[in-house]
Swiss-Prot record:
Pathway: Isoprenoid biosynthesis; isopentenyl diphosphate biosynthesis via DXP pathway; isopentenyl diphosphate from 1-deoxy-D-xylulose 5-phosphate: step 2/6. Residues 1-57 form a transit peptide. The record marks R87, K94 as: Transition state stabilizer. This is 2-C-methyl-D-erythritol 4-phosphate cytidylyltransferase, chloroplastic. Its cofactor is a divalent metal cation. The record marks R224, K280 as: Positions MEP for the nucleophilic attack. GO terms for cellular component: chloroplast stroma. It is an enzyme of class 2 (transferase). One of its GO terms (molecular function) is 2-C-methyl-D-erythritol 4-phosphate cytidylyltransferase activity. It comes from Oryza sativa subsp. japonica.
Length: 297
C-alpha cells in the first residue's frame, strides 16, 4: 500500500486570542496549536490533535474552535477511479469489486453525494465503467460528471480539474479505493481547507520507520512522533491547484499526491487528523479488512 509520510516540527505556543478573525489563507492565532505541513515538513498550525489509542480511530479534538463553515454547494469533488489495481489480481480494477453488495467506488460516492457542501462530483474513470456510476445513487441532488483518466495520477487529477464548476470554492480530490472515509472527516478537512487554502487528511504513523541507504543498511531510525501517513480527501482552492499544475508542467515534475502539487508553490498544507479506518483497498487482505470494518459500523 502506498505510504505518504510527513515530518512535523514543534513550535512555541500560540499567542493570546484576538478579537479579529484571521485571513482565509493564514494560520489563525486565536485557535489552539495544530500541526501544519510546509514543503514536506510540518510547522505548527491551529487545532489540537488528540489520539485515541484504545480504538481504531485517531480523531481530532477541537478546543472549542473549528475551521470556518463551508458554504452549501461550494465544493467540487474529483473522484479518482481510473486505476488498474494490478496488485489485487482480479479480473477488473479493484475499485469496482463488490464490497457488501456495492462496488467499492460507490461507497465514497454515496458519502459525498449526501453532503450539503458538495455541488458536484467529477468521476475520473474509463468510459467502459461509466454505467456503474450513472443512476447508481438514489435521489441524487447534484450532477455527476465524467473525465478521462490520464497516464499518471497527476494527469487524472488535471483532467478532473478541467470539468469542475468555475465558481467552486474548493476542489476535493479522493481515491475511490478508500470506501470508508467518513462524512465527519470530510467536513473537517473541508473546513480546514477554507481557512488555510489547502488541507489533507492524515494519521500519525504507528510503525517504526527507518531510513536506509542504497545498500539497504539502516542509516537512522526516524522519530515516529514526527511522521504522518497521508490519506484522501486532499482539498485545496482550485486556483492553487491550477497554479501548481502550471509549475509541475513547466519543470517536468512528477508528484505522488495532490497536495504535493501545491507544495511546489511553497504554500502551506494543513494536516487534518483523520481516522485509521480510512484505508485504501489495494490487496485482497485490504478488501477483507474493509468488509470487517463496515460490518462493525
Amino acid at each position: 500500500m502506498e505510504l505518504r509520510l510527513c515530518l512535523r516540527l514543534h513550535a512555541p505556543p500560540a499567542s493570546a486570542p484576538t478579537t479579529h478573525p484571521p485571513p482565509p489563507l493564514s494560520p489563525s492565532p486565536n485557535l489552539a496549536l495544530r500541526r501544519l505541513r510546509t514543503g514536506g515538513s510540518c510547522a505548527v498550525a491551529p487545532r489540537r490533535h488528540a489520539r485515541k489509542w484504545g480504538s481504531a480511530v485517531c480523531a481530532a479534538k477541537a478546543d472549542g474552535a473549528q475551521g470556518e463553515a463551508v458554504k452549501e454547494r461550494s465544493v467540487s469533488v474529483v473522484l479518482l477511479s481510473g486505476g488498474q489495481g494490478k496488485r489485487m489480481g482480479a479480473s477488473m480494477p479493484k475499485q469496482y469489486l463488490p464490497l457488501l453488495g456495492l462496488p467499492i467506488a460507490l461507497h465514497s460516492l454515496k458519502t459525498f453525494c449526501q453532503l450539503k457542501e458538495v455541488k458536484e462530483v467529477v468521476v475520473v474513470c474509463d468510459p467502459d465503467y461509466k454505467d456503474i456510476f450513472e443512476g447508481s445513487i438514489e435521489n441524487v441532488q447534484i450532477p455527476i460528471k465524467f473525465a478521462l483518466p490520464g497516464k499518471e495520477r497527476q494527469d487524472s487529477v488535471y483532467n478532473g480539474l478541467q470539468e469542475i464548476d468555475g465558481d467552486s470554492e474548493l476542489v476535493c480530490v479522493h481515491d475511490s479505493a478508500r470506501p470508508l472515509v467518513s462524512s465527519e472527516d470530510v467536513k473537517k478537512v473541508l473546513e480546514d481547507a477554507i481557512v488555510h487554502g489547502a488541507a489533507v487528511l492524515g494519521v500519525p504513523v504507528k510503525a517504526t520507520i527507518k531510513e536506509a541507504d542504497s545498500n539497504s543498511f539502516v542509516v537512522k531510525t526516524l522519530d515516529r512522533k514526527t511522521l504522518w501517513e497521508m490519506q484522501t480527501p486532499q482539498v485545496m482552492r482550485p486556483s492553487l491547484l491550477r497554479d501548481g499544475f502550471e509549475l509541475v508542467k513547466r519543470d517536468g515534475l512528477e508528484v505522488t499526491d495532490d497536495v504535493s502539487i501545491v507544495e511546489y508553490l511553497k504554500h502551506s498544507v494543513y494536516i487534518t487528523e483523520g481516522s485509521y479506518t480510512n484505508i485504501k483497498v489495494t490487496t485482497p487482505d485490504d478488501l477483507l479488512l474493509a468488509e470487517r470494518l463496515m460490518n462493525e459500523k
